[in-house]
Amino acid sequence: TSGKDGSHTFSARLNTIFRECITGFDYAQNMVVIKTMPGLASAAASAIDAMNMSVVLGTLAGDDTVFVVMRDSNSAAAFCGEIRTLLN
């Protein structure tokens, strides 16, 4: 869901999917790369897409990697910060 300041918070579904399948993540400029357990990248990408976040321009999933294009580098950094918080 999106906050009134344009930030986003993870839904319970995304929280569960991420906790179960993410093995690593990082960003460069406006691009985020998420590594998952084999076969689970599509589930992670679908969960991100389902959130309809205005800062996410799109996702692309392989077998164990999700590529997320964010609107800008600040959004990518904030998104990775949320993932980090979620996984800790």
Protein language model regions, located:
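Short, basic/aromatic recognition patches that contact phosphate-bearing ligands
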Residues: 1
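Non-DNA-binding regulatory cores of transcription-related proteins
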Residues: 4-80, 84-86
